[in-house]
């Protein structure tokens, strides 16, 4: 008997020391419970319960010898022989079978298909007992933290130490409807994905996503291998995913860089129109070289003074860089201007573009687009030049001619007039003249004020 009491004490220590066996209970809900005390070790006449294999959560009046442990009713120690514990102490098998697919049947936990016939009579025998004792259930325990639902028994077959006790939870709080079907077996080393294996992991439920509102769009099916590989390295298989092809194209969580079937058809014609543009670029290279040489000759004969607009005029390098684009972007630039007028004003924007002669192979649509763009650009240049010309004419004569330098005293007026006619004023020079004129006016105002 000493060995039996020692085994019982270790069993109670196991229940108390293991944190997962103790359910957290909110404060203020513990009823008045008796402390756990070991039985009289000298007494050999310990009363035995009618069924020593039951662990009940119901506080019933018919079982006074049971001790309450945090909502669980444990039998009096010494009722389970130690030989059965010693043989099965190394094995703990917990098999759960959740049948949540049928909403009309209550949910239950059992050993699965092989063990349902063993515990069928026990489930029927304790169903009436669970319904009667559910009213007297204390507020503490495992079942007190779950929301109440419809009535029905819930049985849990827990094969511990080869002793088949039945842990009856509150049936009114576990019977709730969940859409879907889930069959969970034990922990085999490898789960075979076949329709003939009863222990296969099978979960089938409708996935709700922004792109898959209909229930027939996608679902998990563990029996049909598809996209995922069993390469996790722990020996257990993972559930497979089977997704229709139309769901992949409309999936909002798909990768952005992944091309779909419709995108592949649209990518091909994007690069095809560039081939004739390259051919035209090769044909235009000798013409650009000739235009560059003509522009160099015209700039050398036009005079020694250069303006900002001459430096900003397109050259052969700008034509070569823009020729890689389409013909529309290349038509935005204009060639070098012809001989400049010998007037003391800004350069006129009435230059004619040579793009109309350089592109004989262009279509009528390209020519119309180029002509309209050139017209808008010419109007912009004309308005801007008109504003600078009005600013230049508003400046006094000494400001406009004072930019030539102070060493012009030995030069007659005729030569100065000739230089003024040949000289072209840039926009930057006009702004500099206006700044100096404003400074002179401010100095005069300060002198008059003092």
Curated annotation (Swiss-Prot):
Protein's UniProt keywords contain DNA-binding: yes
Composition-biased stretches (Low complexity): 101-112, 305-341
InterPro entries for the chain: bHLH_dom, HLH_DNA-bd_sf, Regulatory_TF_Diverse
Cited SMART domains: HLH (SM00353)
Signal peptide: none
Record-level Gene Ontology MF annotations: DNA binding; protein dimerization activity
Classification via Pfam families: HLH (PF00010)
PROSITE patterns in UniProt: BHLH
Top-level lineage group: Eukaryota
Biased composition (Polar residues): 31-46, 291-304
Gene3D superfamilies: Helix-loop-helix DNA-binding domain (4.10.280.10)
Biased composition regions of type Basic and acidic residues, renumbered to the chain: 113-125, 356-377
Basic residues composition-biased segments: 272-286
Region (Disordered): 18-87, 99-148, 185-377, 398-426
Alphabetized UniProt keyword annotations: Allergen, DNA-binding
bHLH domain mapped to chain residues: 368-441
UniProt name for this protein: Allergen Fus c 3
Species classification: Eukaryota, Fungi, Dikarya, Ascomycota, Pezizomycotina
């Amino acid at each position: 008997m000493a060995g039996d009491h020692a085994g019982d004490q270790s069993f109670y220590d196991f229940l108390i020391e293991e944190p997962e066996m103790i359910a957290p209970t909110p404060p203020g809900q513990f009823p008045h419970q008796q402390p756990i005390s070991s039985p009289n070790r000298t007494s050999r006449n310990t009363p035995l319960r009618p069924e020593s294999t039951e662990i009940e959560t119901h506080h019933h009046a018919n079982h006074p010898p049971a001790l309450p442990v945090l909502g669980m009713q444990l039998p009096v120690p010494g009722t389970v022989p130690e030989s059965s514990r010693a043989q099965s102490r190394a094995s703990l098998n917990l098999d759960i079978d959740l049948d949540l697919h049928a909403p009309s049947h209550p949910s239950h936990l059992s050993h699965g298909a092989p063990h349902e016939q063993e515990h069928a009579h026990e489930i029927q025998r304790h169903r009436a007992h669970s319904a009667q004792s559910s009213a007297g259930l204390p507020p503490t325990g495992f079942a007190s933290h779950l929301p109440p639902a419809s009535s029905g028994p819930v049985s849990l077959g827990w094969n511990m130490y080869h002793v088949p006790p039945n842990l009856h939870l509150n049936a009114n709080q576990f019977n709730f409807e969940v859409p879907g079907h889930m069959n969970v077996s034990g922990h085999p080393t490898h789960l075979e994905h076949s329709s003939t294996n009863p222990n296969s992991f099978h979960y089938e439920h409708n996935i709700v996503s922004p792109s898959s509102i209909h229930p027939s769009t996608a679902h998990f099916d563990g029996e049909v291998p598809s996209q995922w590989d069993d390469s996790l390295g722990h020996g257990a298989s993972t559930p497979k995913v089977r997704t229709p092809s139309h769901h992949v194209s409309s999936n909002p969580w798909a990768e952005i860089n992944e091309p779909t079937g419709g995108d592949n058809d649209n990518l091909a014609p994007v690069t095809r129109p560039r081939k004739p543009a390259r051919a035209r670029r090769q044909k235009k290279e000798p013409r650009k070289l000739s235009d560059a040489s003509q522009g160099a000759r015209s700039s050398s004969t036009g005079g020694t003074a250069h303006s900002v607009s001459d430096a900003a005029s397109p050259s052969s390098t700008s034509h070569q860089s823009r020729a890689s684009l389409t013909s529309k972007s290349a038509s935005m630039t204009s060639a070098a201007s012809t001989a400049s007028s010998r007037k003391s004003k800004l350069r006129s924007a009435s230059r004619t573009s040579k793009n109309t002669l350089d592109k004989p192979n262009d279509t009528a649509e390209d020519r119309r687009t180029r002509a309209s763009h050139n017209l808008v650009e010419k109007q912009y240049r004309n308005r801007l030049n008109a504003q600078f010309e009005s600013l230049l004419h508003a400046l006094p004569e000494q400001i406009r001619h004072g930019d030539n330098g102070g060493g012009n005293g030995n030069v007659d007026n005729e030569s100065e007039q000739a230089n003024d006619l040949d000289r072209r004023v840039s926009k930057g020079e006009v702004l500099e003249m206006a700044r100096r004129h404003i400074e002179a006016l401010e100095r005069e105002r300060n002198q008059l004020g003092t």
